[in-house]
Amino acid sequence: MIRTLTTFLTSSFLAFPATAHVVLQNMEGHAGYQEYVTIAVPHGCGASPTTQVRVKIPEGIMIVAPEQKAGWVTAIIRRKLAEPTIGEGGAKVTEVIDEVSWSNGNLPIDQLGLFTLLVRTPDTPGRVLFFKTIQKCVAGETKWVDTIPQGEPTWKMWARPAPAPFMVLKKPDAPQLGATMQQILEERSKLGSPSATR
């Protein structure tokens, strides 16, 4: 079962009433799926409101689409791959989105801010994706970048001083679209181009 933000925050505040973390709204996702990744910011830097949220995209994520957030400026930083790879539909990919930021905003310390990405997760069930996040405020910043080695129990993340928001990839029961991309491409080739069917 996917553990939601509400469940986490409830248990977190019961266990640690004086603390809260920047987390993902859903901490589990399917390997090889398009997933919404929502970073939840439940507080500021002490008594200072949040003005920027920067997220480092984990290795292996080839597709990223950040949501435009009203009142904030969304920006992306791209990174060239050491070697080109093949992406969706057989297209050659030479660079990927490395970082996404939302800035020039003002999130009060007592309000919850949600910052969303649509990503294509790697096809690696069991892997933990760490979305290292830097929360900048009017005064100061917090770097939510602490991680654990792959294979370690994820509960150990909560013992870290500033755990990075993370998602555990699980094996899906079926392809997200009901068929593999190869099957879809083969079916598409049978139908031909739109102009050929007129």
Where are the language model's segments positioned?
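Low-complexity, intrinsically disordered segments enriched in Ser/Thr together with acidic residues
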Residues: V100-R127
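Serine/threonine-enriched low-complexity regions used as flexible
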Residues: G126-A139
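Low-complexity, serine/threonine/proline/glycine-rich extracellular segments that form mucin-like
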Residues: Q34-G71
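Sec/Tat signal peptide C-region and signal peptidase I cleavage site
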Residues: F16-A20
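Extracytoplasmic/periplasmic copper-protein system
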Residues: K136-R198
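Extracellular adhesion/glycan-binding regions together with long Ser/Thr-
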Residues: K80-I109
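Short, solvent-exposed loop/turn segments enriched in Ser/Thr/Gly
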Residues: G32-V37, R127-F130
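Sec-dependent signal peptide recognition
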Residues: M1-S11
